[in-house]
Swiss-Prot record:
It comes from Pithecopus azureus. GO terms for cellular component: extracellular region. This is Tryptophyllin-T2-5. The modification Glycine amide is found at G6. Expressed by the skin glands.
Length: 6
């Protein structure tokens, strides 16, 4: 997942 999602 991208860092802003999880």
């Amino acid at each position: 997942l991208p860092p802003w999602i999880g």
